[in-house]
Amino acid sequence: MEALKTLLIANRGEIAVRVLKTAKKLNIRTIAVYTEPDAASTHVHLADEAILLSGPPSKAYIDGDQIIDIAKRKGADAIIPGYGFLSENSNFARDVASAGLAFVGPSPESIEAFGLKHTARELATKAGVPIVPGSQGLVTSEDEAVKIAQSLGFPVMLKATAGGGGMGLLTCNTEKEVRESFQTVQSRGEALFKNAGLFIERYYPSSHHIEVQVFGNGQGKAISIGERECSIQRRHQKVIEECPSPFVTRNPELRKGLCDAAVRLAESIDYGSAGTIEYLVDDESGKFFFLEMNTRLQVEHGITELCYGVDLVELMLRQADAQLSGRKGLEAEFLSSIPVGAPQGFAIEARVYAENPVRDFAPCPGILQDVDWKETTGSRIDTWVYRGIKVSANYDPLLAKVMYHASSRQKAIEGLRDILTGSRICGPPTNLGFLAEILANKDFNAGNTLTKFLNNFEYNLAAIDVISGGAYTLIQDWPGRPTVGRGFCHSGPMDSVAFRIANALVGNPVGLEGLEITLSGPELRFLGPAVISLCGAPIDAKLDEAPVPMWSRVKVSAGQRLKIGKTTGGGCRAYLAVLGGFPNIAEWFGSKATAPMVGVGGYQGRQLTSGDYLTISAQIPESDNELSLPEHLIPQYPDSWELMSMPGPYDEGYLAPESIDMLYNAEWTISHNAARGGIRLLGPKPTWARPDGGEGGAHPSNLIECGYAIGSINWTGDDPVIFPQDAPDLGGFVSSHTIVKADLWKLGQVKAGDKLKFRATSLKDTLLARNELERFISDIVQCCQKGEDFGSITPLASSLPPAMSSSTRVSGIVHQIPEKGNQPLVSYRQAGDDYLLIDYGVGAFDLNHRYRVTALKKVLSEAAGDISVSNGLINLVGCGNYLPKALMIYYDGTKIPQQKLIDYLCTIETQLGDLSRAKVPSRRFKLPLTFESKRQTDAIKRYMETQRPYASYLPDNIDFVARNNAFTRAELENIYLTASFMVITVGFFTALPIALPVDPRQRMNCPKMNPSRVFTPAGQVSWGGSCLAIYTVDSPGGYQMNGMTIPGVDILGTKRGYAPEKPWLFEDFDQITFYKVTEEEYERQLALFQSGRYEYEWEVVEFDMAEHNRLLKETKEEVKAIRARQRKAQAEMDLLEKELLERWAKEKAERGVSMDTVEELLKDPEITVIEAPLNANVWKVEVKEGDKLDKDQVVVILEAMKLEIAVRAESAAAGAVVEKILAQPGKSIEAGKPLMLVRRG
């Protein structure tokens, strides 16, 4: 290339990637432009430089002035527009030239000449190219249109002269339809193309859409490069394209006429660059007529390249280079040397879109959770997508152009279909199956490719159309992801008993994915036959108005609707199994289970909603065997529960003895805050055995961090929360007892308002109950598989094992090794029948003990034999907590006896020996940090507006942390910028790193926000208790917000520094350091991260434990003085916080309405009460006093179990006026209590 050295690509998606490949081949430097939704797009990664466009994303790619300005600033020589957007904008082409740059495309005059279809027809006529019989110029009235239509003969087509892409045209078969359509086409032309002009053409119902590729040098020389057929269209949008045309192949004499006419037309206007002349070819006569000329590169240009061995983009760039060099264009001799004879072989292209085939192919944005193209010899896939990319609603949903080139048309069809059926795209629905069925169609294979081909094409789907998603419907499988850890949620069904039995009844493996339905269910339209089973809590369900029996195998016919209503009794979750599961759902770490709190797994990492699309098995057995579980085998779902639990890990020494008794003796109530991430209990307050949480925090329930077990009873302050499937795997609060594995399924069915008691159980009885439960499920599975009667199965025991008395109950500590020399005290604490927590030492936080955890974890991870990751060990969570340092071991208690595990761990302790002089491998990271950020300010503002208006830590978290530790703000910032923060654990939610300063003089302490925030931006640097944390995703949180940095997680593992098998960045004993940046510089680096181009700065180092221990010894007295100052400052801040908290609580109470007022109003016969339908939290009040209500109007939105429940004005309240609002946002309310009083007129 002589003059074209730098190229700006003014486009996105696959065409931008396609251009980049040729530009790189020609050693042209490339500049990409992109919008925020496209930040992670492939063209951004591949370009030499990428510039973020400003303005609304939907308009940024057509902001010609901005794009030209970028090109000039960045030293571009030319701009290539691709197709769409600015590619056929003559004003843009002219502006590019005026800026001294080359427009890689035809001249503005050529674009204008063919921009309006009626003038293009005139040019074609002058060039001797036959046109479709029609009007001469534009038609200005209905009467004129009718007259012309009558002279042409019906059917006719009304076309907007500025239209394109199948928009702005209608077919008319009668005079009446012409009159009805005239105004419609005019208005569409004006709305879509700013031009209301229209013309009329004769419509040929049996025709082909065939186009000829041309290339001109702008000096009167043009060549044709064969034809393509694009007859397979939906709503005039191309779906399948072929080169050569099968119709032309059968009528070879037609090729010369088509190509010669195309060349004449291009040469008649001195066309320069690539262009396409489109024809309508009558199937009966073989006559061809000019339709339009596209003055740009076509989407389907690739199949021409495959059959003719040319690179059309290269030709366009060489033409631009010649123009820049002053030669006006390529030499005629050069064009003549390009081989343009008969095509070599056959190529077919299929356009793959993210679109819903059951919703009229509506575009479907969303995250592509898996992308796996099958590529073979002969294939070419032009795409911009990959695993993890988000398809934006702002742009065309084209994902890829899949092409296949072969020696014959039949081989090309077979090869392309093989690619389509062998490729896998999970996330929003696509048209892959639709395209494959077209290729399998006998008429298509025979070459009968008329433009009306798809009018009557039948696409047989094996899928479910989600009409409505229900209150909270998730895809789950069993057992979920027990081995991932790092805060990515265990996931899986909350009630695994009902889930597994549902699968067994339909004939699935018990762990196959199904639907978990909470409180009220979805409405599903089955597009193909299916076999289903609905199990779990009693719930109303109908199949085309016929009741659906629960705990039964049910056959569903194509077209039937399953409507699952509300739960009707005890329990809150039901499970729907479908034979074959849902093949289009991607696996993440080997599971399809949804973890909605961290946005992974399932359908887009979220609950189902209207418009979602689930594929199902197309292979349905013909057998009509009915199968139902006998009533006496169906589990019971009461509203009062008793759950077996075991002490530990932190009972004695944390809770006072009388509070341990209280836990078992009290009757607890399930709060409205009962969800997959935690089930809060209402009941008596505990007495604590210690005054505070030490380095973990001011409250005795606080720890620095420790591992959490599923089923743990965790104390967040004085309130207990049970941790179910989606709970964090570590945190900073005491877990005193743990519900045993045999009773975890019951947690999935407790609902707000239910009563609950705990029963102390021995390990022996726990394992017996667990084996009994597994035997029960196994027996049912075998009967379902063999078709046997269920009569031999023993029901689940209705009674629990004998409760242990306070005198026979044991401590959570099941074994200890005394301190000896440099080997610390080791305490082994049980957490139910599947978890064991190993504690090291007694005293303040000590990295020596934390390294011992790391060393133990390494030995266990590499172990082989009876106790190993492949044999009974499930997961390991290393933490640092209040006094000791700990490792939580998650193991299978049915495979490894607890005592055997303890014995093995004791042996390892002996082998570890003295680690006080160890040299520990470490990585030291250097991250940007800005203390001032709009993201952080907005999060605090949101908190103050919606949660708590004032507190000791508001409005400035940084100032609070400084004052709480007797520092100035400058001193606190200096700590952040000079300290090395040691990562002591990675977990909680989404691999959040928790770290402490290595130098004890730089350690701090501060309370967490109360209440916790509902929103924290990703990248937030925060402090809570004694720890620093970096929030890796947008999430709730309670640590004080002190600055912003780069997050350390990429969920699908596609960004630099990550991998699908390791989507987290930080590991234990990594070190984090910060350097200060401005907010502007931070946003620049964050944009690099979001686009996948950020390069983390880190180095491999050794952490010397001996040197660290010397530091601890040398600074001991200095640290004591620092702690004394900090304790004094913290005491002052504690007093302030108590005062502000009491004032806030009082103000909230005063905003309520007195019961005397309520009772007085209720005496009025015209007053009607709108009640809360369930125990919940008031989220929003949607009306105000004095409003008149409409029927079904939403008056209040409640939040319960992480669900939004809309309370509506039913018919009795329709027309009434709101008299008194009793519910206030943020307040809890019980089922049946009044939300507001309304007065009927």
Swiss-Prot record:
Entry annotated with the keyword ATP-binding: yes
N6-biotinyllysine sites (modified residues): 1202
Keyword Transport: no
Name of one Pfam family that matches: Biotin_lipoyl
EC number: 6.3.4.6
PROSITE patterns: ATP_GRASP (PS50975), BC (PS50979), BIOTIN (PS00188), BIOTINYL_LIPOYL (PS50968), CPSASE_1 (PS00866), CPSASE_2 (PS00867)
InterPro entries from the UniProt entry: ATP-grasp (IPR011761), BC-like_N (IPR005481), Biotin_BS (IPR001882), Biotin_carboxylase_complex (IPR050856), Biotin_carboxylation_dom (IPR011764), Biotin_COase_C (IPR005482), Biotin_lipoyl (IPR000089), CbamoylP_synth_lsu-like_ATP-bd (IPR005479)
Gene3D superfamilies: 2.40.50.100, 3.30.1360.40, ATP-grasp fold, B domain (3.30.470.20), Cyclophilin-like (2.40.100.10)
Domain Biotin carboxylation, first and last residues per copy: 3-459
Taxonomy, superkingdom: Eukaryota
Record's keyword terms, sorted: ATP-binding, Biotin, Hydrolase, Ligase, Nucleotide-binding
Binding site for ATP: 117, 201
Induction: By beta-alanine.
Any GO MF annotation of the entry: urea carboxylase activity
Residue ranges constituting the ATP-grasp domain according to the UniProt record: 121-321
Domain Biotinyl-binding: 1159-1239
Reaction catalyzed: urea + hydrogencarbonate + ATP = urea-1-carboxylate + ADP + phosphate + H(+)
Obligatory cofactor(s): biotin
Record function comment: Involved in the utilization of lactams. Required for the conversion of exogenous 2-pyrrolidinone (gamma-butyrolactam) to endogenous gamma-amino-n-butyrate (GABA).
Name of this protein: Putative urea carboxylase
Lineage: Eukaryota, Fungi, Dikarya, Ascomycota, Pezizomycotina
